[in-house]
Amino acid sequence: MYAVCECRTRGIVGVGESPYLCIVKQIKRRKMKRIVFAIALFLSFGLGYANNNVRTIKAPRFARPLVEKWIEEYAKTQPGVEFQIVKGQTESDLSVTIADQQEAVTDNFCHLLYIGETAVLPITARSSEAARLLEGKHLNAKKLKQLFFLGDEFDDEVKNKAFERIIVYSGSNASSVASSFAHNFGEESTNFRGKRIAGDDLFLNTAVAKDPLGVTFNTLSNIFDLQSRHLKSELSLVGLDLKKDVANSFNGTLDEVLTILENTKPAEVAVEKVGITFNNNDEAVRRFLQWVLENGTKYNHQYGLLNLNQKVAEAQTDKVQSKLTAQK
């Protein structure tokens, strides 16, 4: 009688309905609660398992297409571990960085492996007033310093009033190649003339496209079309004082530029190593790095990066293999 009253009180069974119906409904409710609990537990376990098998990578814009290719190809060999690119202030398991910026990431990572090099060239908008002013100049390192940086210490022989009309655009983002370009000429990134552009270095291309007097600089992967392998149609390289064979290569395809810069390093061109910073306590990360060094670097040219020389490349492979061995 109590069970029937309780059922009626809870609204499980109505007046006049069989008490057995009440019992059946109670059993069904209890079973449903168990099923819901089991599903929640399963989903919670599955989510935790998925999170444990996800690793994250940060990469500057110029290297992002290459990293995306690594992730795509690595997934074919190791489907149990997923690597994802993250942006902004989000923490990551790995970070692709220019060697010149290594100090900025040492607080979060304790190891660095080099995977290639990036080259930075001065550019302006095609057929712009800046391109006209710089036409035929063939600037050496000294004249490039005068064009891009503040300072009154330059010799009279390199002073050029035409330079004073030109507006320099440089990146202010922490991952910008501005510091690499500046350090190549013995300068600091705080000493650029002109205007600073926040955000991705790709915005530098947009800035000079809008300003007829604008000049800037960027990585090869940002100034060449990775599909056609030619300089982007809206851009023009600033003429540099280079040896004839180097200058001829700069008039060719991206692959010609990469090849010549792997064999010679003109003072007028900023070339910096690109590396991956990481912690050494994750076997999945170390195995991914081993794959990158053995298989991923073959995509360097495709995505606008120079290859390391053989000695440096072998040293990186030895480094990651020793870390894998040490963990066994």
Predicted regions and their residues:
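Residues that line or immediately flank small-molecule/substrate-binding pockets and catalytic motifs
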Residues: 39, 99, 220
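Pocket-flanking alpha-helical
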Residues: 89-110, 223-227
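Bacterial Sec-dependent N-terminal signal peptides
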Residues: 3, 20-55
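Exported/periplasmic ABC-transporter solute-binding proteins
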Residues: 50-78, 86-88, 111-118, 123-328
